[in-house]
């Protein structure tokens, strides 16, 4: 585990049941595991106190029930009628189309418009011109709406997220602040690569979900195969709570198998739901799937297990209660089905959100209370309007009135005109304007309470920062979202001399998007941008042109390699610089070894041979070396440096001496430890019509990829493979050529793996040549 306990903290990896507590200045800590909910018993890892997670939702619920006993009735009632949900899925599964129907059926919009701007309008939630042109969601978009169920109006805060892996940070930040989600799965393609990624993200933030199998009107739709894949690939117990009436072009509606009622969408746009008896030809299937639902629930819910074992027939209320408990407990996902494009099956999903997803006070949210002495302790946040305000800034956008900051309120109220404290800086900021977002439209409000999502202007902050009420005696910090590492880079420069607008764009975009990195290379004198993929960087280059009027010249995309070692070695390095007057002297000795995962620095000095302040300088020297390896100048991964001895000079030793000595020892030991270059390996999923299967498999083999799985459908096949990112440049052109433009693919970072010896030699030679040219 590599931890830098100062202003900057990198990815911290710990045993799964533990997550590190860090000083409040590190409120933007990037976490590689669950980041939101934790409990109280606290051992220590490398001097960093950790907090144990409740092992089950039942343990969380004990705390939640105690909190709810203290809440005022008004807060309980407001929370009962509120749901915070996200819509997530693999690209092109129909998320935005689904969201458009949700907004229409809840009365939030007056007309339905389709993705890609086919009618010159485009879907409401895809408000960027680039989104409408490309037909994909690039930024998550927030809105709110109301849904009436059984004469009660429920308030939904809803976020539509991108499906493309290049924009995965939008999913991360949405799930960080949401209480539940609707996972959309294609009835034809089933569980795809990004579905697996979204599932992993939901688990990371403990977000329960209901699943909607979309595109039931398409040829080859098979909802029960998709449910089987959810069980097998996502390892999530799932069962249908509906069966379709008809399929493909004959899709007419769905049967709710819990209460055995057929539901038909009628009206020009499916706005009317007509209930009827179950068609005779479906009664046997309904009973079969109902029995399977009860059996699955008996495996994940104790109350249903008792009913099942006693041979009793559960009531509708008992089945719904079991589904709700198991779903909120993250043990089960109920599956609904329909077609968003055909306007069928959407309203029952809204009912399922009310019935099965949690209200804000059913989720345990926790922060770190920081005392004036600096001592930190976990504290449970109270979803009460009378408690001191606590909110998390989870998304930034540049609006026409300045920076727009999205905030999730966890505790207390936020009022227009009030002041709040930025926990990281201690500054008090005024909430001059408070709005609720409806995609790119804003609606002013005077105050928002616990569980709400809002936005405000003119606040200088970063994603993941915590805010508190200005008059609060407490200081509470909340953990941020997980930020993945960039895998691709390219050089960029403005064509014109308009460096002011170019710099402004760079600063804005890297502030809004933590996965978009900008750095200046002092050797090449170039600005380097890094991101999650070719499309990710391509979008930003286009946005610089459109939003700032700056055309840019870009270099060839470069892979973000890593440097590592494969054998242990020892080091004994002396840094000596004496040329009259005060000199420099530092000697370090120890061991250098490969390590799986992140980097680690440790020391064990007996007898005070190296003073503590010099040891800290050694750790800083180690951190410096990790940024630029000796082989090709890329970041270092998977090394453990342990200092166990050393020597000082009474006059010439200093922090700089030992920092420099450590850097020299690092380089010397690294080159002796059988160094290797690691390249990013991508998980690739390719779909195309069956007649092109041979061509696609041949293309993957030509790229040196390893095929993991091939699934043949009625009309299409899907190949899952692992390929090096280096071989994937220009892949979209090759795939179009061999499938006549009918193939699709998606990429996701999988792991780092050793390059071939030939490629390693070529990369080193190229790097050495570039260095020589600069001399």
Swiss-Prot record:
The gene is MEF1. Mitochondrial GTPase that catalyzes the GTP-dependent ribosomal translocation step during translation elongation. During this step, the ribosome changes from the pre-translocational (PRE) to the post-translocational (POST) state as the newly formed A-site-bound peptidyl-tRNA and P-site-bound deacylated tRNA move to the P and E sites, respectively. Catalyzes the coordinated movement of the two tRNA molecules, the mRNA and conformational changes in the ribosome. GO terms for cellular component: mitochondrion. Residues 80-361 form the tr-type G domain. It comes from Scheffersomyces stipitis (strain ATCC 58785 / CBS 6054 / NBRC 10063 / NRRL Y-11545). Residues 1-45 form a transit peptide. Belongs to the TRAFAC class translation factor GTPase superfamily. Classic translation factor GTPase family. EF-G/EF-2 subfamily. One of its GO terms (molecular function) is GTP binding. PANTHER family: ELONGATION FACTOR G, MITOCHONDRIAL. The keyword Transit peptide applies. Transmembrane segments: none annotated. GTP binds at residues 89-96, 160-164, 214-217. Keywords: Elongation factor, GTP-binding, Mitochondrion, Nucleotide-binding, Protein biosynthesis, Transit peptide. Pfam families: EFG_C (PF00679), EFG_III (PF14492), EFG_IV (PF03764), GTP_EFTU (PF00009), GTP_EFTU_D2 (PF03144). This is Elongation factor G, mitochondrial.
